[in-house]
Regions:
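N-terminal nicking endonuclease/strand-transfer module with a His-rich metal-binding environment
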Residues: 1-231
Length: 231
């Protein structure tokens, strides 16, 4: 995510991502008492792997090294506003869960056909919280035991942040994290298309998912047009 060259100590391999472009911003967020050496990205993720090793030096088959949040920024925000919003979100995550967050903002790859408004961020969270010594401690269980509730909490938090920053930017646009059903709306939700379907779209190739989504969008457009006529 960070477009860096990282060395995996566990397997002695070098992972070179320096050819990746479009990283607008990157930062590691951690509790204030965290050992300073964990603010280095390579050290951090090597320590994460080390915490999941078996006695024979191999990573446990069931090991989960990180959790990931992916967020999309409102197109009305500029670079400084996106960074400020990410700062606030990651600080909230760190405060609530006591973990480290490794976050990167990516600019859209317009050369490959990506929507120029698609500024987004990847936030990798350690699955272990920081203990009293400032090092990786126990596994966080809340995402396992209360996954749905935690996801809903952060969706709501993100929507609140979006709307506050949109207001500060002087925009009248607002977002709502709730489903159309929860909002009492008759609009239909589309299905997430993913990178493969998106790439095929750019090539002019239809898929079952893209065709269904296009039909949903058309029906939604008709409903919105009807509502405008009724008003």
């Amino acid at each position: 995510r960070s477009a860096e060259k990282l060395i995996c100590n566990t397997y002695g391999k070098e992972q070179d991502y320096t050819q990746k472009t479009g990283v607008e911003f990157k930062k590691i967020y951690a509790p204030s008492h965290t050992d300073k050496h964990l603010s280095d990205r390579q050290t951090l993720w090597n320590e994460v792997e080390k915490s999941e090793l078996k006695k024979n030096g191999e990573i446990k088959a069931t090991a989960q090294l990180a959790r990931e949040f992916e967020i999309a920024f409102p197109q009305e925000l500029n670079q400084a506003q996106r960074q400020k919003m990410l700062d606030e979100l990651c600080q909230k995550i760190v405060e609530r869960h006591g973990v480290i967050a490794d976050a990167c903002i990516h600019a859209p790859h317009t050369a490959s056909g990506s929507d120029e408004r698609n500024y987004h961020a990847h936030i990798l969270l350690t699955t272990r919280s920081i203990n009293e010594r400032g090092t990786l401690g126990k596994k966080t269980r809340e995402f396992n035991d209360q996954g749905k509730q935690q996801v809903e909490h952060w969706r709501a938090q993100f929507a609140e942040l979006c709307n506050r920053h949109l207001e500060q930017a002087g925009s009248l646009e607002r977002v709502d994290h709730r489903s159309y059903k929860a909002q009492g709306s008759e609009l239909e939700a589309t299905q997430h298309e993913g990178s493969k379907v998106t790439q095929l779209r750019r090539q002019g190739i239809d898929t079952e998912i893209s065709l269904k989504n296009d039909a949903v969008k058309a029906r939604n457009a008709e409903k919105l047009a009807s509502e405008q006529l009724i008003k």
